[in-house]
Structures are given as C-alpha cells and as structure tokens.
C-alpha cells in the first residue's frame, strides 16, 4: 500500500513517516499544490495512493483546497475507490472539522500532535490497518 504525507513542518513529516513506514510505501510533499501533483502522478503511473495524510494549514494551497482538487480529479477520471484522506491540524475548531468533511469529503481528522495511537485508530476505522 502507498501513503502520501502532505505536511509543511519538518518534525511533523518525520514523526508521521516513522509511524507509517512499516505499513506503507511513503512519499512526502510539503504543500497542497505538490499533493495534487503527486496524486495525479500516482494515477498516471498506475500506482495510486491508498492513504493521504494532509495538514490543513500550509503555504501556497491549503489542505482543504488541495483535497477538493483531488476529489474533483477522482470524479473526472472516475477513479474508484477514492483515496482515504485523513486531515491533520493544530486547530481543534469545529468549523474547520466540518469544512474538512463536507467541503473536502475527508475520510478522517486528527488534531495535532498526532500520536501513533490516534493515527492507528483512524487507520483501523478506514480499514487500512487490522486490529
């Protein structure tokens, strides 16, 4: 399985990679624009991402906007199943959570700092990790 980490903070990228590296082939990008490019490339190479972990607050293109673009691509290309996308953010704000799920159609949401336990719990819910 393949995972894409979309995170602008170095330490967060390093921690998330350490949590996922035994479960997934992991790629890392630093903003939403690169996330959309990596997503497209994965499908063009017939090697799509099973999981995308995406920060919300990032430079250039934020996580919610990037997720909307990814979902639009999935619809245009009739890609099924859709990628599982877990949004990560330091903002524990109900409005941001709702926007992630309803505007971006996120699969899950984790408030930072992300722990191994919270990430694995989300992966279990999304059936990407067995108990």
Short names for language-model regions:
Residues 58:
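Receiver (REC) domain active-site loop signature in two-component systems and cognate sites
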Residues 7:
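Conserved acidic carboxylate
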Residues 80-82, 92-108, 121:
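Alpha4 helix (beta4-alpha4-beta5 surface) of REC/receiver domains from two-component response regulators
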Residues 10, 28-41, 63-66:
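Helix N-cap/capping motif at the beta->alpha junctions
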Residues 43-53:
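Active-site beta3 strand of CheY-like receiver
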Residues 10-31, 104:
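Two-component/phosphorelay signaling modules centered on CheY-like receiver
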Residues 114-124:
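C-terminal output helix
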